[in-house]
Amino acid sequence: MDWRPWMDAFLPPLLEALPGRVAFVGIQGSFGRGEAGPESDVDLVVVLDALGAAELAVCRGVLEKMPFADRACGFFCDRAALAAWPAFDALQLRLDTLPVYGSLEELLPPM
């Protein structure tokens, strides 16, 4: 599976379901590194302006409609949580995440 068409199908419904609330979407793991096999997970990074149970339910609803939904996993957080990360975690996220929508640079603490 090529992750790009999958992401092209995922991103518009996510942006529509959470208008103005999505700060960043990226891909990690084997797809992000170009090492994915036929059974690889789709490792997402999604950062919202604020994240609670309602927002997680919306994200889950969008993901459940996707092909290979059972392979979607990853990290969902909000701006405030990400801004408070220690530098070593922020560096790892920067190095291991391929941006698809938005930029991590404005969301992470300065290096």
Language model segments and positions:
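Helical scaffold of the NTase/Pol beta-like nucleotidyltransferase catalytic core
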Residues: M1-G26
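Generic marker of residues within folded, mature protein domains
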Residues: L15-A17, G34, A83
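A generic fold-level signal
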Residues: G20, G37-E39, W85
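Catalytic metal-binding acidic patch
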Residues: G29-G61, C73-F76
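Conserved NTP/Mg2+-binding pocket subregion across the NTase superfamily
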Residues: L56-M111
